[in-house]
Amino acid sequence: MEKLVLEPVTRIEGHAKITVQLDEEGNVKDTRFHVMEFRGFEKFLQGRRIEEAPRIVPRICGICQVQHHLASAKAVDACFGFEPEDIPETAYKMREIMNWASYVHSHGLHFYFLAAPDFIGGKDRETRNIFKIIQDSPDVAKQAIELRKNAQDIVAATGGRAIHPVSFIPGGITTELDKETQEKLLKKAKRNVEIAESTLELAIPIFEDNMDLVESLGTIETYHMGLVKNGTWDVYDGVVRVKDKNGENFAEFGPDEYTKYIAEHVKPYSWLKFPYLKELGYPDGVYRVSPLSRLNVADKMPDAAPKAQEYFKEFRNKFGYAQQPLLYHWARLIEMLAAAECMASVLEEDLSGKKIHGKLERQEGEGVGIVEAPRGTLIHHYACDKNGIITKANLIVATVQNNPAMEMGIQKVAKERIKPGVDVDDKIYNLMEMVIRAYDPCLSCATHTVDGKVKLFTLEVLDSEGNVVKRL
């Protein structure tokens, strides 16, 4: 019996590998997605003061830092007895602006730097990278950098700094915007609307040219989950909506109810858990959270995003209730445009209000904060004692919730492509990686080698006793 090992999985945030177990005839017996790093932030939080949590958790990730900051702040809000409507209006809007800016930054990073090389990069692994895109299309590369810089400038202005922001506090925010700064940010937001729309116009024909791959690669049927507010796409507030495999509403629940619906399965070969819908059990209750999931569960895009609404309608008409992982890229770009439009719309409003946080009253209790991170639904759940010391912390991040689906997707690719007598080459490995990349997993703050000069994978052949007999 042989085992094929793909390590590392490239162009993702973090460290992971894929193993494919073959039977005696050379057919695929099992496929696993391994995450080898251990973070332990839930333990780090225990014993700390509850108001410190929003300053600690952005260190979980350098990409979706804003969403950890925000989910934590919402959980701490709840611990202090604040409801979303209790947050001062200016603070609420500022929180949304930073969240949307982070979406533009993250989605832009993923498309241009991590995903696009599979579609518009080189044909072999040495040229399938961002540097090939820079060489062939320098104007596109400059546009990608401008998009991300504009978004990060807005995060810095609203969050106190661009990396690991600090401005969200219990009951509000610490940052104020003067009129001059607001006007500068509005120009950046409007420019990002233009870039986001041009990115869609660039990408859609490319996706359509690869529709055979888009329709088939790693496609599985699962439930989908995401926030909606009165049925509308929302990434900050609302209720969690779950739709079944056929696109019918399965459940809707608020933050405090998530434990009634979500449970977690554990497997010995990965630090990631395998969440599922409690009522259905594992694996029948496997669900996904993602840009595609958010479009699947939403009835429409926000009124502040009319351009994104048009792309959303076209997408829904073309694909209906979509299950294909490679459509995540298309959905991600629709969201990037929506976030840019919403951000520009709010930056045109009056943000001069001086009341930016509420009055705190210490209390013992629990709080749950749910937001939509770029990669999907993010849950922070804290409990604190009468002295405001954290006694329990539970974090359910988007990549964890997508973990079962990612593994199912690569198993489907492996069984379709790896057959007895077939030479397992770089193209097959990259197809499995493409499924993983579609989910944009965020496993840590690091991204693997993308320049093509370092060896991108190691193939180990093991005997039936697990001994390495060949390393390629």
From Swiss-Prot:
<dbReference type="GO" id="GO:0008901">
    <property type="term" value="F:ferredoxin hydrogenase activity"/>
</dbReference>
<comment type="function">
    <text>Part of a complex that provides reducing equivalents for heterodisulfide reductase.</text>
</comment>
<feature type="binding site">
    <location>
        <position position="445"/>
    </location>
    <ligand>
        <name>Ni(2+)</name>
    </ligand>
</feature>
<dbReference type="InterPro" id="IPR018194">
    <property type="entry name" value="Ni-dep_hyd_lsu_Ni_BS"/>
</dbReference>
<dbReference type="InterPro" id="IPR001501">
    <property type="entry name" value="Ni-dep_hyd_lsu"/>
</dbReference>
<dbReference type="GO" id="GO:0016151">
    <property type="term" value="F:nickel cation binding"/>
</dbReference>
<keyword id="KW-0533">Nickel</keyword>
<comment type="similarity">
    <text>Belongs to the [NiFe]/[NiFeSe] hydrogenase large subunit family.</text>
</comment>
<comment type="subunit">
    <text>The F420-non-reducing hydrogenase is composed of three subunits; MvhA, MvhD and MvhG. It forms a complex with the heterodisulfide reductase (hdr).</text>
</comment>
<protein>
    <recommendedName>
        <fullName>F420-non-reducing hydrogenase subunit A</fullName>
        <ecNumber>1.12.99.-</ecNumber>
    </recommendedName>
</protein>
<feature type="binding site">
    <location>
        <position position="442"/>
    </location>
    <ligand>
        <name>Ni(2+)</name>
    </ligand>
</feature>
<feature type="binding site">
    <location>
        <position position="61"/>
    </location>
    <ligand>
        <name>Ni(2+)</name>
    </ligand>
</feature>
<keyword id="KW-0479">Metal-binding</keyword>
<dbReference type="Pfam" id="PF00374">
    <property type="entry name" value="NiFeSe_Hases"/>
</dbReference>
<feature type="binding site">
    <location>
        <position position="64"/>
    </location>
    <ligand>
        <name>Ni(2+)</name>
    </ligand>
</feature>
<dbReference type="InterPro" id="IPR029014">
    <property type="entry name" value="NiFe-Hase_large"/>
</dbReference>
<keyword id="KW-0560">Oxidoreductase</keyword>
